[in-house]
Amino acid sequence: MERTDGQLSAHSGTDKQHLLQQLFSDMLEDIYYAEKHLTKALPKMSKACTTGELRQAFDEHLEQTEMHVARLERVFGLLGRKAKARKCEAIEGLTKEAEDLKKETEKNTLTRDVALIAAGQKVEHYEIATYGTLVQLASNMHLNEVVSLLEETLKEEKAADLKLTSIAEHSVNWQALEAEG
């Protein structure tokens, strides 16, 4: 294969396909770790909420996250593999940031809920980006059943993000401003 700079590429088409499959596998293990990690982090976020509406959103997303873990285990099975988690530094950092925000805000305040929404949305955006990439890679590899499962999770992650946006825009942010003002 030729590179655009005129040099021969060190990788053949088969090697490049293998590299993409390896990237897909690594990302799958990464998001599996992330989802399992979130099953422990979401209850802490829920417990820290001031408003019932936000607590309910985190509780509902915990239920979905448990389904995401099971769905990923099905994906691994479809690929003929045992589910394997690969430490996800991104989710570790995002959940640590959520813990830090919780410590930096006063308990039972709407300001804490604003911080928790921001932290939750950062997690959702990471998941949306990861699942979006996984869907595209699986599609390119013609893994149709895998695509369907990953698209289902992607749709749920986007809905969770929109729910947090709605809670922020329609109640928590305004209430926090009024409480501070």
What role is predicted for each listed range?
Residues 1-181:
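Amphipathic alpha-helical hairpins
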